[in-house]
UniProtKB/Swiss-Prot annotation:
Coiled-coil ranges from the UniProt annotation: none
Species, as recorded: Opitutus terrae (strain DSM 11246 / JCM 15787 / PB90-1)
Cellular localization per UniProt: Cytoplasm
Keyword set, alphabetical order: Amino-acid biosynthesis, Cytoplasm, NADP, Oxidoreductase, Proline biosynthesis
One Pfam entry name: Aldedh
Protein name: Gamma-glutamyl phosphate reductase
Cysteine-cysteine disulfides: none
Amino acid sequence: MSADLAQLVTLIAQRARAASLTLATTSTAAKNSALLRLADLIAGSTLPLLNANQLDIAAAKKHGLTQAQIDRLTLTPIRLTQLADSVRHVATLPDPVGEVLEETTRPNGLVLRRVRVPIGVIGIIYEARPNVTIDCAALCLKSGNAAILRGGKESFHTNTALAALIAQALSAAELPADAVQLIPTTERAALTHLLTLDSLVHCIIPRGGESLIRFVAEHSTIPVIKHYKGVCFVYVDREAHLKMAEQIVVNAKTSRPGVCNAAEQLLVHRGVATKFLPAIARALNAAHPVELRCDAESAAILAQENLPHVAASDADFSTEFLDYILAVRVVDSIDTAIATINRDSSNHSDAIVTNDTSAANRFLAGVDSAAVFWNASTRFNDGVEFGLGAEIGISTDRLHARGPMGLRELCSYKWLVSGIGQVRS
């Protein structure tokens, strides 16, 4: 890596640290002013943003990205409107900074308060989705954190255009423009250097594929909160309402197959497999043709009715396809389903469909994932759907946050201790 590149990344981190100290004491009104200005800028910049996005889409097609990957990259007028609305929504959310989490008075008269404070400087490493640029900027700003954004090469032009709007919004609210910065290169060396700046950056959040997250975890000297791949299961129990199960599986698989909370694996109890599997194959085909990768038992059931399928490999049951592909397996019990999910899933989002409350509670307690659903689609594992506002991502870690990371999850805490001259004996 060149000395100039290292110097540039270090300077970005130094400026972010200085900005974070200002943001930590910035009023809610000032932060909301910047957010509302950003929303207006997004809404008023549709044409230049779409033009920048088209440059990225053209490059993606040239380099052979899949349709699902291109969908994640693509902005449309509707998606830009939704993006602006999500920023406005963040402005309406309660400011977590300064919230008193607990207060107590010690026998010696000391008054202790534990209050929420920003983490400080957060580095966010992500790939194709340009909406992450805005979502992360909005959430970091509202929670009083400075953000260093490093997007992927797939969305470089779009991210650059969005970052310019963020800087304008911050300046308009008289906040430091360095509070949100985009690293202006996609060179891997810049990322590697950023990951060593533990005296300036307090947390790294990678969002992307397995190779990116492993690279960040292996090279970072800064604490990492991983937003790992979504290998998400739906289990249809023998006591399931089968029409409900159809609707849930179709939604979980086909509504947006390129996102991390889409279902990738389907487990079906043997007691309902003969009836359910042909029905779900037809329902999926009616919504959008889905390639079913089946174990031997499910393949035999579909073959009896001449329904299309292919043989699954062992790897298919732990793969995030991000496409119209679903791995299908028949299981003999709920215990087998739970064990399979805990072995093969990414601990992200998993669901059971059943009318048996006892079975549901067993599944909810036994599946070790960030979000576990009963009679609902895995697609609901989302910050907006959980009432958190736009999320910074969905953590599959156990520390410091798990599941959708909203404003509160972007805070730490500190102790405020008030006395009247007490000294320790």
